[in-house]
């Protein structure tokens, strides 16, 4: 597999004030990993949700307030949090500058169950050829 040029991947708007760039998923040939960057404006991030697999949330730049079950923590650049499979979690940007986080999930597609059912729960899933 040739090297991946991450900047060639498009930025996607996931919700107001949150842009996402997929770095690796089933769409790029991954079988067991999904990795993406998110760029979140002040006060914004990811609403409460769970995944069926483990996730690592790493702060690349900025400061995040992360909720993991009932625990709230402040996470800074070059720090990460392991989110166990099935654990409720969320995060938000608590600084004025844009928060850059990297999420790595132990699955090749993004799947989540959100408290807010209006959120899109599945992304980067390959299409099935029906021909």
What are these regions (language model features)?
Residues 82, 96-114:
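A short hydrophobic beta-strand segment most commonly corresponding to one strand
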Residues 1-33, 113-131:
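A short, N-terminal "cap"/entry segment at the start of jelly-roll beta-barrel domains
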Residues 36-51:
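Conserved short histidine dyad/triad with adjacent acidic residue
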Residues 52-53, 71, 87-88, 97:
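A generic "binding-loop/recognition-motif" signal
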Residues 48, 66-67, 83, 89-95:
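Short beta-strand His + acidic residue motifs that chelate non-heme Fe in jelly-roll/DSBH
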Residues 54-55, 59-64:
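Glycine- and acidic-residue-biased ligand/ion/polar-headgroup-sensing regions
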Residues 70-85:
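Short acidic-glycine-tyrosine-enriched beta hairpin
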């Amino acid at each position: 597999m040739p090297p991946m040029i991450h900047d060639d991947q498009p930025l996607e708007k996931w919700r107001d004030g949150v842009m996402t760039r997929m770095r690796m998923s089933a769409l790029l040939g991954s079988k067991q990993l999904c990795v993406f960057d998110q760029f979140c404006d002040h006060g914004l991030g990811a609403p409460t949700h769970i995944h069926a697999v483990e996730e690592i949330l790493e702060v690349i730049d900025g400061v995040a307030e992360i909720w993991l079950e009932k625990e709230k923590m402040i996470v800074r650049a070059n720090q990460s949090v392991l989110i166990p499979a099935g654990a409720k979690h969320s995060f938000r940007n608590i600084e004025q500058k844009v928060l850059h986080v990297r999420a790595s999930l132990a699955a090749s597609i993004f799947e989540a169950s959100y408290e807010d059912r209006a959120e899109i729960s599945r992304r980067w899933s390959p299409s099935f050829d029906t021909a």
